[in-house]
Amino acid sequence: MTFRSLLQEMRSRPHRVVHAAASTANSSDPFSWSELPEELLREILIRVETVDGGDWPSRRNVVACAGVCRSWRILTKEIVAVPEFSSKLTFPISLKQSGPRDSLVQCFIKRNRNTQSYHLYLGLTTSLTDNGKFLLAASKLKRATCTDYIISLRSDDISKRSNAYLGRMRSNFLGTKFTVFDGSQTGAAKMQKSRSSNFIKVSPRVPQGSYPIAHISYELNVLGSRGPRRMRCIMDTIPMSIVESRGVVASTSISSFSSRSSPVFRSHSKPLRSNSASCSDSGNNLGDPPLVLSNKAPRWHEQLRCWCLNFHGRVTVASVKNFQLVAVSDCEAGQTSERIILQFGKVGKDMFTMDYGYPISAFQAFAICLSSFETRIACE
């Protein structure tokens, strides 16, 4: 059913609001989409979400409806569910919202060795060879004492000064510890509204990208024994009780996705602890301890003579970069859950799969996977 026929069908229904609006409308004036009655508009958007609200590229129709005007945008945000419940990535803000609870969002990463860049795509089919929909891009910047990974919404504009800037990840000198920074401002940031536009400007006195949201550490292999890498991720903004009680993770509101410079691309969760990368320091007396992720223990395959994990067909090439992360339920005892929150693996020379789920977001999962690309001889 076309959009024109849909409107004709809705107008033919006996509805007093529609007739009232039609009686007062001037036929000589051009029709304004913002003047549609709310009841009619809601039914239209619900049908668009139902019919064309599947996977990409058909989902672009939902995004197009949100860009018509303010009234359409407000209703669209009420109708479209967050990825946690819909398993769909619709707007840019979805990349900083928690993944689905009962499944994993299947993505893949393409590496460009020449430009030291990494592109994240959403898998459109179950095949590992589809083109996918572009989600995020990252660029590797080597410095004297560390390495930075700049993460952006645009592949052609990866910089901290860009409106598409999401955040960054910085490693230490050895490449064994990483800190993920969100591009949002802290509570001390001053927000100013421009007189000439609706864009929100941030005071330059507060540097961007200085808000840590996760710490990643790789265990040093001082004895030189061969085996899979051991990593641990402390998610500063996600409490451990979220996984245990199946609660709701505080995430960015979708109400402001209309502005490029607004916090549409920013998360507003507050850190639960001070900067630390050890499990023993994850607890605090001020509230719930943060979520800790650790490698799922692999098993040794005697016939293949290698360490094995069940990726359910999503990984085809053996590599030390491959991993599956699960929640650590008891830091002191080292107990872990069985539910996989993030898995990453190699399927080609410069092709990797990335599947993530609740309670982490695509941005957090992408940053964790980027740390696996860093060369660290002490951990091999």
UniProtKB/Swiss-Prot annotation:
Residues 258-283 are annotated as: Disordered. Induction: During imbibition of seeds. Gene3D superfamilies: 1.20.1280.50, Tubby Protein, Chain A. GO terms for biological process: abscisic acid-activated signaling pathway; protein ubiquitination; regulation of DNA-templated transcription; response to fungus. Pathway: Protein modification; protein ubiquitination. GO terms for cellular component: plasma membrane. GO terms for molecular function: transcription cis-regulatory region binding. Keywords: Abscisic acid signaling pathway, Ubl conjugation pathway. It holds the Pfam family F-box. Ubiquitous. Residues 30-76 form the F-box domain. Residues 272-283 have a biased composition (Polar residues). Part of a SCF (SKP1-cullin-F-box) protein ligase complex. Interacts with SKP1A/ASK1 and XERICO. PANTHER family: TUBBY-LIKE F-BOX PROTEIN 9, TUBBY-RELATED. Component of SCF(ASK-cullin-F-box) E3 ubiquitin ligase complexes, which may mediate the ubiquitination and subsequent proteasomal degradation of target proteins. Confers sensitivity to ABA during seed germination and early seedling development. Belongs to the TUB family. This is Tubby-like F-box protein 9. It comes from Arabidopsis thaliana (Mouse-ear cress).
